[in-house]
Amino acid sequence: MSLYSETPSAALLPSGFADLLPGEAEAEARGIASVMEAFSRHGYQRVRPPLLEFETSLLGGSGESLAPQTFRLMDPNSHRMMALRPDMTTQIARIASIRLQDAPRPLRLSYSGSCIVVGTPGREADRQISQAGIELIGPDSAQADAEVIALGAKALAELGIEGVSFDLSMPALALGLIEGVIPEADREPLLHALDRKDASAVAELGGPIAGMLAVMLRAAGPADRALDLLASLDYPKDVVGYFERLAASVAAIRERSPDLRLTIDPVDFRGWRYHTGLCVTVFSTSSREELGRGGRYLAGQEPACGLTLRPQALLRAAPVSASRPRCYVPVDLDAASLSGLHKAGYATVSALSHDEDAAAQARHLRCTHVWKDGAARPL
């Protein structure tokens, strides 16, 4: 009996889900391994949270913001509702605040794995996504922000991704201004206008802070120019600290990575539901899609900063790497020769019988080399 149905419909997968075939799957695995090795070299220890958790655990606290993107199902054993993670950050926060509460701080953790998101009806997008990231838990400082961003930049550089840009934002800066003077009932239209970068609507809805918000709109762009414009504003005492932290974080990043391209969007609020300070989105000139995002948040009651990269997006942005050469070898090749091929970087494909025409079989199996006269010979 076949392990799967051989009807034509067997190849049909739900929208947003896809098989990764050998070349793609291997490239993604190599990319994740490269990123995780970069994190490990800098002291970030790997953890592996489960794909499923009880709904009350996964979506409690700041995880509540993930509810609209979460698949749910009933546990047939406990009859409790469970949820498939749409993001791993809240799981890392749980591990840090409960399982590793006695571990020394700063706590540096890394992770990788698959997530499942509900997606947006009518839009074609991945609903099974890969994540690989780091979280720095304990310190609340510009240097901690800079460490996370600089390490993310190093990981991308090792993949050969060029034209990388880190777009910084500080949602609390504009939100602090708005909450101080704009009635709650009038805030949503103003936030929507800022999100659309609609200067005329902001001027109409901004009331006494319309001028400051207009400067913030104009400030979006290269970090140095943005900071110069933002520094010209007269902030209330309870808001000025957000600007000072943004400037300090940029300076700390520059110190670690002088050549890193930084931009600032002071009125970017999209997707920063549980973040409390500096936020970052990663882009590249070689791709139109977002490569990753992160920022500052609370892990339980502790300050934390993290960055989550999207390996599938990284794969599309990175240059195509040469695949491992494949050598077709005889069924009875000795162990020493096999070991030598593996150390030289070859994948070996073994014959299952004594072939009359090894070269023909090697080509059939898409090998690049064949074992002949005691060595790997190119086909």
Swiss-Prot record:
Annotated SUPFAM superfamilies: Class II aaRS and biotin synthetases
Matching Pfam families: tRNA-synt_His
Pathway: Amino-acid biosynthesis; L-histidine biosynthesis; L-histidine from 5-phospho-alpha-D-ribose 1-diphosphate: step 1/9
Keywords linked to the UniProt accession: Amino-acid biosynthesis, Cytoplasm, Histidine biosynthesis
GO CC list: cytoplasm
Signal peptide residues on this chain, from the entry's feature table: none
GO biological process: histidyl-tRNA aminoacylation; L-histidine biosynthetic process
Transmembrane segments: none
Gene3D superfamilies: Bira Bifunctional Protein, Domain 2
Major location category of this protein: cytoplasm
Location(s), subcellular: Cytoplasm
GO MF assignments: histidine-tRNA ligase activity
Keyword Cytoplasm: yes
Quaternary structure annotation from Swiss-Prot or TrEMBL: Heteromultimer composed of HisG and HisZ subunits.
HAMAP family given in the database record: HisZ
Family under the similarity heading: Belongs to the class-II aminoacyl-tRNA synthetase family. HisZ subfamily.
Additional remarks: This function is generally fulfilled by the C-terminal part of HisG, which is missing in some bacteria such as this one.
Biological function: Required for the first step of histidine biosynthesis. May allow the feedback regulation of ATP phosphoribosyltransferase activity by histidine.
Protein name per the record: ATP phosphoribosyltransferase regulatory subunit
